[in-house]
């Protein structure tokens, strides 16, 4: 109803997620420049297994993770399950006519989820005329994802796990939903925090979500965020 609520507090702790926190802090500091939102570019792949994979879980966790020595990418592999096939149909309704076929063959499907390091981030946020624009720019990142997917395919095929059939889907920049790194530790700009996660020049404001981290190599960083929140909680 366009109403403002004003309250006074000695300390304010933000743990509302990178996008929401970044919007609030940008607005608070009146920052108008473009801010890069770091994330892990993603590629989905599905392979056809030579043998059916039997399991009893409705949702099968990752059975195998493959990481490059340099940390440039990692991939997790898991068998198909009803939750995955239903999610595919929800996201891409044009697969509805073959829903029965997808569910019938899902025990021969191996799904791969490839994530790149944060150097390939391509999501930005900027405040323009009191509104926030979130956007991406033209990039050739899909070429890198396809290249690494070929490595996964060769590994599975050479070990006689799959047939030479696969399908890939690049959902676009930001579709990984691993957003972080907008308000990093010890940056020179106003958008930064100290070792106690206090906002620069505003030490009554604490930020404890993914905004403060650069998870360049760690593609599954939830544990780090939780551990840091507990650390800051003890300091308070």
Question: What spans do the regions from the language model cover?
Answer:
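A glycine-rich dinucleotide-binding beta-alpha-beta segment and adjacent secondary-structure elements
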Residues: 147-216, 222
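Short, conserved micro-motifs enriched in small and acidic residues
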Residues: 15, 142-143, 216-223, 227
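N-terminal export/assembly segments and adjacent metallocofactor-ligating motifs
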Residues: 58, 149, 234-235
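C-terminal catalytic lobe of FAD-dependent flavoproteins
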Residues: 93-163
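Mid-to-C-terminal "cap/lid" subdomains and adjacent gly/pro-rich loops that border
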Residues: 3, 10-118
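An active-site-proximal "capping" alpha-helix that borders the catalytic cofactor pocket
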Residues: 153, 223-236
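Short, well-ordered alpha-helix to beta-strand connector turns
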Residues: 8-10, 202-203
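Short helix/loop capping segments that flank catalytic or ligand/cofactor-binding pockets
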Residues: 22-24, 123, 194, 215-217
């Amino acid at each position: 109803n366009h109403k403002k609520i004003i309250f006074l507090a000695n300390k304010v702790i933000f743990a509302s997620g990178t996008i929401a926190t970044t919007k609030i802090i940008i607005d608070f500091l009146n920052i108008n420049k473009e801010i890069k939102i770091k994330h892990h570019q993603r590629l989905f792949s599905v392979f056809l297994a030579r043998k059916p994979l039997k399991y009893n879980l409705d949702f099968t966790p990752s059975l195998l993770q493959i990481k490059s020595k340099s940390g440039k990418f990692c991939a997790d592999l898991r068998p198909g399950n009803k939750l995955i096939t239903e999610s595919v149909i929800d996201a891409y309704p044009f697969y509805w006519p073959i829903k029965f076929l997808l569910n019938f063959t899902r025990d021969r499907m191996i799904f791969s989820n490839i994530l790149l390091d944060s150097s390939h981030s391509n999501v930005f946020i900027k405040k323009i005329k009191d509104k926030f624009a979130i956007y991406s720019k033209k990039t050739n990142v899909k070429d890198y994802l396809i290249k690494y997917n070929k490595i996964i395919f060769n590994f599975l095929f050479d070990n006689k796990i799959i047939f030479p059939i696969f399908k890939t889907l690049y959902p676009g920049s930001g579709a990984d939903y691993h957003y972080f790194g907008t308000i990093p530790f010890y940056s020179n700009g106003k958008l930064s925090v100290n070792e106690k996660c206090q906002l620069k020049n505003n030490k009554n404001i604490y930020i404890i979500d993914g905004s403060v981290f650069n998870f360049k190599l760690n593609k599954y960083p939830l544990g780090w965020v939780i551990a840091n929140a507990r650390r800051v909680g003890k300091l308070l």
